[in-house]
């Protein structure tokens, strides 16, 4: 094995290993961090914004590492003699593209097929013209009839918050599940690349 091929293969395997490590860290953080830190919201405090900037930076670094591993695995495979074009180079080359395609497909499917909680939350509210409550010129709160004391015509705030909390938990579980699949797949690809490189150095 020439020095040039040895360098390209080392860079490829190292990049894939760092990529797998970042995916593992991201999965663990996502599983333990509150979903509110991961979803876009308004009026966020500086700590939340700082956390999201870190997540964004990690995503950019992961993209660079995955691109490096794909490029250098491809260069190592197609730049090697036919006798040295081992399958682990092809496997390592397709790890990042398959991972990206899986995450993109999962995200696309989730947006096109919302869950029951999301459909319930996104259901249209009754038109204002159909309301039996006269809001008046200076609206502060709808009128409450004596028979409905203690009830708010806007609905139960607790039930709305519970539904929203359920949606956030489902979203977090879905993100963690998809990240776990990609992480395991990437780690397996990294392990087989290390084994392939180790065996190649000893038996070729």
Swiss-Prot record:
<keyword id="KW-0472">Membrane</keyword>
<feature type="transmembrane region" description="Helical">
    <location>
        <begin position="89"/>
        <end position="109"/>
    </location>
</feature>
<comment type="similarity">
    <text>Belongs to the ATG33 family.</text>
</comment>
<keyword id="KW-0072">Autophagy</keyword>
<feature type="transmembrane region" description="Helical">
    <location>
        <begin position="11"/>
        <end position="31"/>
    </location>
</feature>
<keyword id="KW-1133">Transmembrane helix</keyword>
<keyword id="KW-0496">Mitochondrion</keyword>
<keyword id="KW-0812">Transmembrane</keyword>
<feature type="transmembrane region" description="Helical">
    <location>
        <begin position="64"/>
        <end position="84"/>
    </location>
</feature>
<dbReference type="GO" id="GO:0016236">
    <property type="term" value="P:macroautophagy"/>
</dbReference>
<dbReference type="GO" id="GO:0000422">
    <property type="term" value="P:autophagy of mitochondrion"/>
</dbReference>
<dbReference type="GO" id="GO:0005741">
    <property type="term" value="C:mitochondrial outer membrane"/>
</dbReference>
<dbReference type="InterPro" id="IPR051668">
    <property type="entry name" value="ATG33"/>
</dbReference>
<protein>
    <recommendedName>
        <fullName>Autophagy-related protein 33</fullName>
    </recommendedName>
</protein>
<feature type="transmembrane region" description="Helical">
    <location>
        <begin position="175"/>
        <end position="195"/>
    </location>
</feature>
<comment type="function">
    <text>Involved in the selective degradation of mitochondria via autophagy during starvation and at post-log phase.</text>
</comment>
